[in-house]
C-alpha cells in the first residue's frame, strides 16, 4: 500500500509519527491530511533517508536546484553544490542535469544525499532523443515513461511532470498574446513534441500509466507548471489558470488512486498578484501542497534575483505556499556556481522562516525569541549560532571587532542603544 492508501485505512505509520514529532503536530491529524492530499511525505520506498513532510500545518520547506549543463559537466562540483545546499538548510534538492553522463550524475547525487531528491525526467528523455534520433521531437511515448521509471528505480523521491501542457493550450498559445509563450524547459519540450506530431501530451493522455508507475515506488508527482508566467506581463493569465485547473483535476485522480501530488506554481508575479495566486491554487487544488518558484516580483533583478524571489517567497509562504524553490543570483544569466547556491539557499530559508513566523509556526517564533534574548544579554555565541550563516557572522565580527567593550559591536560601541537603555531602566 502507498502512504495515501494506508492513511485512508487509518494506519498511522512510524514514518508519519516521525514527521509529526519533528513538526510538532498530532500524528492523527497529519495522517488525515496525507489521506486527503493536503500533505505529502517525499521518500521513495527504495531510499533510507529522513522522511520530508510538505504541506498544510507544517514548516515551509525549501528546495535547491543543482545539475550539469552541456557547457559544464563537472559531477564533483555538483556534489559539492549539494553539500553546500544541505549545509545551509535545503530540505530537498533537484537534479536538473542536461549535460554529461546523466545517469551517473543522478545516481551519484542519490548516493551522496541525505535529503529528498527530485528530478525532471523529460530533460533526460530530450537529451537521449537528440543522441538517438538527432531531434527532441522524435522521442516516443515509451521513451518518456521508460526514463521516468528509471528515475524511480534509482530512488528519486519526487519527479516534475508537465501533465497540464495539453494540446488545446498549445494551440491557444499560437494566438501570440503572451510576451513569453513558455519559459518552462520541460513544458517547451513537450509543446514542441505536441506540435510536431499533432498529438496530445503523453503525460496527460496516459496519466493512468504514470499513476501506475508512481504507485510502485510511492513516488511523489510534482505536477509541473509548464505555462507559468515568465514575466510580470503574463502573470495570472488564461494559460496559467487553464493549466492550473487541468492539473487540479489530475491531482484529484491521483489522490483517488493513492498517489501523492505537489502542485507547482509561478514564476514571475507582481506583489499584488501573490495572494490571489495562492488562494486560487488552494481552492482549485483543494489545499494540495503548493511548490512555487520564487515567485519573482520583478523582472529586472538580474544578478539579485534571489532577493526578488525571497520577497515573493515570503509573501507566498505567508498566504499558504508550502514549498519554495530557491532562486540564485545567477538566475537568467548562467549556470550557478557554489557561492550562488549558498546565497540562493540562505535567501530562500529567510523567506520560508519569515513566512512561518507570519503563519504562527511555534518553532519559528522560538528561534526569533531566542535571538532577541541573546541580543539583550550580549550573548554573541548564541546570536551567531541562531543566524542563517554562522560562519559569515563570526567572520564579520572578527574582522572588525569593538575596540573596548566586547559586549557591543563596532557600529555603536559605547553608544549601543541596548546597553544604554538597560542601564537606564534596570
From Swiss-Prot:
Bound cofactor: record note: Binds 1 [4Fe-4S] cluster per subunit. The cluster is coordinated with 3 cysteines and an exchangeable S-adenosyl-L-methionine.
Pfam families: ThiC_Rad_SAM
Cofactor(s) in the UniProt record: [4Fe-4S] cluster
Binding-site positions, Zn(2+): 268, 332
Keyword vocabulary terms for this entry: 4Fe-4S, Iron, Iron-sulfur, Lyase, Metal-binding, S-adenosyl-L-methionine, Thiamine biosynthesis, Zinc
Binding-site list for [4Fe-4S] cluster: 409, 412, 416
Broadest EC class assigned to this enzyme: lyase
GO annotation, cellular component aspect: cytosol
EC number: 4.1.99.17
Residue sites binding substrate per the record: 65, 94, 123, 162, 184-186, 225-228, 264, 291
Pathway where it operates: Cofactor biosynthesis; thiamine diphosphate biosynthesis
Family annotation (InterPro entries): ThiC, ThiC/Bza_core_dom, ThiC/BzaA/B
One Gene Ontology term of the molecular function aspect: zinc ion binding
Catalyzed chemical reaction(s): 5-amino-1-(5-phospho-beta-D-ribosyl)imidazole + S-adenosyl-L-methionine = 4-amino-2-methyl-5-(phosphooxymethyl)pyrimidine + CO + 5'-deoxyadenosine + formate + L-methionine + 3 H(+)
A GO BP annotation: thiamine biosynthetic process
Functional description taken from the UniProt entry: Catalyzes the synthesis of the hydroxymethylpyrimidine phosphate (HMP-P) moiety of thiamine from aminoimidazole ribotide (AIR) in a radical S-adenosyl-L-methionine (SAM)-dependent reaction.
Family: Belongs to the ThiC family.
HAMAP family: ThiC
Protein name: Phosphomethylpyrimidine synthase
Protein's organism: Thermodesulfovibrio yellowstonii (strain ATCC 51303 / DSM 11347 / YP87)
Lineage: Bacteria, Pseudomonadati, Nitrospirota, Thermodesulfovibrionia, Thermodesulfovibrionales
Amino acid at each position: 500500500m502507498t502512504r495515501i492508501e494506508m492513511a485512508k485505512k487509518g494506519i498511522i505509520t512510524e514514518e508519519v509519527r516521525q514527521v509529526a514529532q519533528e513538526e510538532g503536530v498530532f500524528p492523527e491529524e497529519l495522517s488525515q491530511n496525507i489521506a486527503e492530499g493536503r500533505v505529502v511525505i517525499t521518500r521513495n520506498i527504495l531510499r533510507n533517508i529522513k522522511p520530508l513532510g510538505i504541506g498544510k500545518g507544517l514548516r515551509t520547506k525549501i528546495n535547491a536546484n543543482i545539475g550539469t549543463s552541456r557547457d559544464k559537466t563537472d559531477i564533483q562540483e555538483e556534489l559539492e553544490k549539494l553539500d553546500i545546499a544541505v549545509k545551509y538548510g535545503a530540505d530537498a534538492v533537484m537534479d536538473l542535469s542536461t549535460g554529461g553522463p546523466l545517469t551517473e550524475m543522478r545516481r551519484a547525487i542519490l548516493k551522496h544525499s541525505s535529503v529528498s531528491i527530485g528530478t525532471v525526467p523529460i530533460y533526460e528523455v530530450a537529451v537521449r532523443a537528440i543522441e538517438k534520433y538527432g531531434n527532441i521531437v522524435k522521442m516516443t511515448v515509451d521513451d518518456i515513461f521508460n526514463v521516468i521509471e528509471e528515475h524511480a528505480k534509482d530512488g528519486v523521491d519526487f519527479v516534475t511532470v508537465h501533465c497540464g501542457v495539453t494540446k488545446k493550450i498549445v494551440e491557444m498559445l499560437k494566438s501570440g498574446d503572451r510576451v513569453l509563450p513558455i519559459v518552462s524547459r520541460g513544458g517547451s519540450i513537450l509543446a514542441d513534441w505536441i506540435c510536431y506530431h499533432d498529438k496530445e501530451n503523453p503525460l496527460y493522455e496516459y496519466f493512468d500509466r504514470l499513476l501506475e508507475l508512481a504507485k510502485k515506488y510511492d513516488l511523489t508527482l510534482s505536477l509541473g507548471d509548464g505555462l507559468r508566467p515568465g514575466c510580470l506581463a503574463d502573470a495570472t493569465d488564461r494559460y496559467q489558470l487553464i493549466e492550473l485547473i487541468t492539473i487540479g483535476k489530475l491531482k484529484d485522480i491521483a489522490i483517488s488512486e493513492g498517489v501523492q501530488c505537489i502542485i507547482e506554481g509561478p514564476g514571475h508575479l507582481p506583489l499584488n498578484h501573490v495572494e490571489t495566486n495562492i488562494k486560487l491554487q488552494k481552492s482549485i487544488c483543494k489545499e494540495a501542497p503548493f511548490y512555487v518558484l520564487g515567485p519573482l516580483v520583478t523582472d529586472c533583478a538580474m544578478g539579485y534575483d534571489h532577493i526578488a524571489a525571497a520577497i515573493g517567497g515570503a509573501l507566498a509562504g505567508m498566504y499558504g505556499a508550502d514549498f519554495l524553490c530557491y532562486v540564485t543570483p545567477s538566475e537568467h544569466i548562467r549556470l550557478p556556481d557554489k557561492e550562488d547556491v549558498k546565497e540562493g539557499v540562505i535567501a530562500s530559508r529567510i523567506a520560508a522562516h519569515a513566512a512561518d513566523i507570519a503563519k504562527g509556526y511555534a518553532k519559528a517564533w522560538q528561534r526569533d525569541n531566542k535571538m532577541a534574548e541573546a541580543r539583550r544579554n550580549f550573548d554573541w555565541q548564541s546570536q551567531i549560532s541562531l543566524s542563517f550563516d554562522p560562519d559569515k557572522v563570526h567572520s564579520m565580527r572578527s574582522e572588525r571587532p569593538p575596540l573596548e567593550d566586547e559586549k557591543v559591536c563596532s557600529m555603536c560601541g559605547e553608544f549601543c542603544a541596548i546597553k544604554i537603555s538597560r542601564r537606564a531602566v534596570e
